Amino acid sequence: MELLWYIIAALGAGIGTGAVLTLLGGFMLLLYFWPQISRFPLAMQTLQCFGRLIVYIVPCVMALLPIRFLTGVPSFVFRKMLHVVAFTCFVVMMLAAGGWQAAALTSVIIAVLVYPLLSLFENESWYGKLFVQKSPGEVKRSLLMVFFMFAAVIAVSWGVFHDPNAAAAAILMWGVGDAAAALVGIPFGKHKVNFRPVNGKKSWEGSLAMFTAAALVGIVILCLCSGSFTGTSILCVLLMALAGTTAELLSPSEWDTVTVPVTMLAVALVLL
């Protein structure tokens, strides 16, 4: 137990040091250029988005550290817990943003900041213990793709089609559906999907779980939150879930974080 607490303390120190140095550097730049920055509404809205992300992410990370090192939670479960924090925090940030430009810009800036930060620490011993990687460098590549995907989905759905609910639905349906596929498919997936080009590692049980979870989330977002509980909305949600599940089956492992939400969003924008 003492060793576990030592590991957590070391992790907290490493992560905390990097985070504090990054925040201090950003804060000093912010103070220096504040007279210029405060003149631009987009800059102020983007700073508000950053603030919401920090308020959301920090408590989540503090809660996940002891779960990772003080419990016997399987690695694939913890990986999905990290994913849940990532996609929910950006949806919350987006829906509370003053405009799509600020939300999309925040996603891009986070990608630019996180990638070199993870590259700096990826050779540390605690990095491999905290993050669950399928291959070397997979976490930072995945996060880079996810953040740019968030920016693109927000820009297209909200910026072009003026529909932030569709972006929220696509991101949440993908995130929850992907988690359900892993949580059901890995321990209970007995019947593998063997037709080409599926790689044979995915199961019908996991795909069914993804479809069901994605459909339920889509109904809540598109139908209840938008006040449009109609047959057309239900059909749209089911087709989004089906298209996303199919995209997940056919996509290479690391690319499903992009192909699935983009496919779901495309279906929503065409049908709604």
Give the location of each predicted region.
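Interhelical loop and helix-boundary elements at the membrane-water interface
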Residues: 1-27, 31-54, 61-105, 114-224, ...
